Amino acid sequence: MRGRPASFLGGRRMAPQSCATAPSDGSTVLLKRDAFGAVWLCRDDARTWIRREVGSVRWWLRPLARAAMQRERRALLRLRGVDGVPRLLANGCDHLDRSLLEGATLAERPPELEWFRSARRILRQLRHRGVAHNDLAKEQNWLVLDDGGAGVVDFQLAVIARPRRPLLRLMAREDLRHLLKHKRAFHRAALRPVDRRLLARRSWFARAWRQTWKRAYNVMTRRVLGVRDGEGT
């Protein structure tokens, strides 16, 4: 992915800019900025990494942005050593540093069938560690890594609980459903009967979300905050 940092987030490349919380002796490129903060590609002589920064968020949204960032921190700590998940490098009150995953979005590099097997292995590891991503409908949260395997980023909305808790099991099932939706988009003929049954059975949470909170969420994020989340079908 080196040389095409904007691909990491599915956004357009932006010119290098200064970052108040980025190393002063390195270089930074702004990859994304929205109502909940900024994401930077940071480089120095020894390494390249990603920094999420929330210090510039409007004061009334800052507590929410900090809470989401700390949720990502907790998730990454639980997922240390899982292939295809960024490593937590450092964090502070208003920033979080994580390792860079070299790869491209699903739109930029349509995944091969083997990629979906790799993605399912990641989801099994997440559930085993007590984490559900909770935002995998978005194509940009999945990566096709340079070796062809799967990668997952952006754990701000993750659900963290004991693996056997009903909520965790429910949300892990929704993660799998969203992966199968992407499989249907790229390899419909490869769907197994069990995959089709799972896609057809939307959980009570998914039904309630679509009928009630999703509408309010879309109004808040798109009309009030001007954030387009790129959620998949």
PLM region spans:
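Juxta-kinase regulatory segment immediately upstream of eukaryotic protein kinase catalytic domains
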Residues: F8-V29
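ATP-binding glycine-rich loop module of kinase domains
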Residues: S27-Q70, R74-L77
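Active-site beta-strand termini and strand-to-loop segments that position acidic
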Residues: L41-D45, L100, L145-D146
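Conserved structural core of kinase catalytic domains
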Residues: A65, L77-R80, G84-S118
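Conserved hydrophobic core/spine positions of the Hanks-type protein kinase catalytic domain
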Residues: I122-Q125
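Catalytic-loop of the protein kinase fold
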Residues: H128-E139
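Conserved protein kinase catalytic/activation segment
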Residues: Q140-V152
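C-lobe/activation-segment region of protein kinase-like
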Residues: G149-T233
